[in-house]
Amino acid sequence: MKAVFTFILSFFVAYFGFGQEKTLLFSIKGKDTKPSFLFGTVHMIADTAYYFPTKLEKTLGKADQLVLEIDNIGDRAKAQKMLLLDSGNVFDQFTPEQADSIVQWGSSLLGMKPEAFKKSFSGMKPFVLVQIGVQAMMNAHSKSYEMDLMSKAGANKQPVRGLESMESQFAIFDNLKPEVLTEMIMEGIRHPEKAAETQQELVALYVAKDVEGLAKLIVESEDIAGSAEELLYRRNRNWIPVMTDYMKTQSCFFAVGAGHLGGDQGVIQLLKDAGYTVTPIAY
C-alpha cells in the first residue's frame, strides 16, 4: 500500500546537464507541432510546501490549452459513480479477520462508529479504502495543483483537456489482481508509519524539483515493482501519441504527476525518443 500512496501522491537521482538547478517545468518542441510545455505535479500537498510562482503562471498563459492526466476531471458525479461496486459488498473480498481490521482502522481514522463505517463503505470499490489512508495523511490545509491549474485556465479562458479518460484511470486499479490490492491495503494498515515516511520523502523530492529522484522512489518501492507496467509505464507510452495529436494544432501546457516524468520509461525520455526536444525551464 505504501506504493499506492506513493503513486497517488506523486506522484509518481540524476542530473540533466544544466547545472545544479533542477526543475519540474520543461518546454517541448518538435517538427509540425506547436511549442508546448510539460509540468510535473503532485496531486495533493500541504499548503506550506505548495509553490506556484509568477513564472509558472505566465508559462501556463502562453499555451492555448491546459491538458491534464484525466479528461473531465471536474465531473465529480461521474467520479463518485465509478467508485461504486457493480454489486456485492467490498468487505466480502477479504477474510473476516482482514475485514475486521479494515473496519477498525478506517472507523478510527474517520472518527466513525465501526458499524457506520461498514455501512457507508460496503458498496465502494477496494480502491476507496486506499483513499482513506491518503486523506488521513492530508491535513485540512492541503492544496491540489490540478485544481489550481484548472482555476487559472478558466480565468484565462483556456480549454481543459485530458490524456486519458476517467474510465481508463479507474480501470488501472480495477484490473489489479485482487491479491495484490488486498496486500497493499493490509500492508498500509499493519505499517501506517511506512506510508507517512514515504510521503515525507516524496514531498522533499518534489520541493527539491528532483524528477529523477521521484521516479526512482516510486519504481523502487517494494510493492510497486510488479505493477509498474500497469501503474506507470503503459500509461506513459499511451500518452505520447495523444500529446502529439494535441500539439499538432494547439500549444499545450501538459500537467501530469511528477512521478511520470523521469526514468528511461518516463514521459521526458519517451518524448525525446519520439523526436522532440525537451528543455528544462528554471522557475
Task: Give a label for each model feature.
Residues 20, 48, 234-238:
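Short secondary-structure boundary/capping elements
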Residues 1-26:
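Bacterial Sec-dependent N-terminal signal peptides
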Residues 11-12, 43, 259-260:
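Short, glycine/serine-rich, charged loops/turns that create anion-binding
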Residues 226-283:
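A cross-kingdom marker for long, charged
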Residues 23-24, 52-54, 240-241:
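A generic local structural motif
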Residues 27-37, 42-223, 230-231:
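Structured, acidic catalytic/metal-binding patches in enzyme active sites
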